[in-house]
Amino acid sequence: VVGSDSGTDDSLVDAQPGNAAGARRTLVERLQADGVLTDPRLREALSRLDRGVLLPRAYVRRSEPGTDPVVWELLDGTHPNDRAEWQELVYSGESVLVQRDGEPPESQVRGAVSGGRMTAMSTFIPYTVEVLQRMRIAAGHGYLDLGTGPGVSLALAAALTGPRRAVGVERDEHMAAFAQNNLERLGAGATMVAGDALDGHAPRAPYDRIHSGIGVPCLPSAWMDQLAPGGRLLTTLTTRTPSWPGRCLVTRTATGRIEAVLEGGPRGHRPLYGYTWLTAQHHLHRIADRPGRPRTTTFTPPADEAYGFWLSAAYLVPGVFRHFQADTLAVVAPEDDSWAVAGPGDGTVHVHGPRDVWAELENIHNLWTRAGSPDRFYVDIPADGGQQHVTSGTGPDALQWVLPPLAAMPGQPA
């Protein structure tokens, strides 16, 4: 997992039986071919990281979508009947589910279980690679990883910083201890602590690089306080919709000034513990059966890749969820029992409910266009911990909004 200068015992690189080295090679080659992996140091770290040590067991869903309760199966990478499927999953690059209902990982029993929710997982590896490359981690940097989970991202970061420079904070004490033990088996030179990610980790501050593996509604003041001059912080800014995440890059200049840029993107981290996303699960069958009243429309929503528009919609058309599995664009305001479903390119839209979410999207599109179709926004972070304002610029047509405070969100128990 780490370079030769970190003291890694090469005998640990393939701690699990089977062709893990070949699976790692295939994953790295695919990431390179897709243009995701460009940093040679990170390529070396990925080539050496035995994910099987950090993800020795994994849950897979066995029931059909919509089934309640969900049926899961826990795969054990050391069991001959599970080995092939487990290894394919662990090295697929997909997110790997590793904990159900906060269970101690050491108590997990291979086999089928029913119900419950997943409380820890690894991150989609292309996104992990994208984040780590954007962080520009150098040897010797002090690195803080927040919401670390099983420790995959932390292990890769530690390979870039060198030993004893990377620390992770995980709220679940069972997962923190489990990850620390596995990191030690790898000789990763990283430290895990149990605690509230919103508090950062003051004992090792300041940090040259801070990465948050949880989405937050605004930027916690503790994170700002623990960012060193010249430092970079990367986090997901989350709203109540999972459909359009924001990615915020915070830098502290050499003179100590904080600057923050917010952009939309195709994916982000899940929100902090206790934060509830909107869901349209109970509306989907109704939308399919009775899409609503038809009417003509001249509004053609921009492409999915117009991340600036969709990020603006997440804040300025609040409480709306996109149904990505629909054949055409469908947006739902579940708490208002309202939705809009675009026609199949025929200039029509079907609307339902007291809230005209289609008209709201059209209005925001007009404002976004008038503002210059911005794809990035600027976050003002007052030193006194006051409201954090977002703007697309300084002109009279600039889009702007205020980030919701952390105080309005459920806390994270340590």
Regions found by a protein language model. Name each.
Residues 2-144, 153, 385-413:
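Class I SAM-dependent transferase core
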Residues 42, 57-62, 226-227, 237, ...:
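A short, aromatic/hydrophobic, helix- or strand-capping loop or linear motif
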Residues 336-414:
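C-terminal target-recognition/interaction regions appended to catalytic cores
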Residues 303-325, 333-334, 346-362, 366:
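Basic, glycine-rich polyanion-binding accessory segments appended to enzymes
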Residues 35, 50-54, 212, 365-372:
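Short amphipathic alpha-helical segments enriched in hydrophobics
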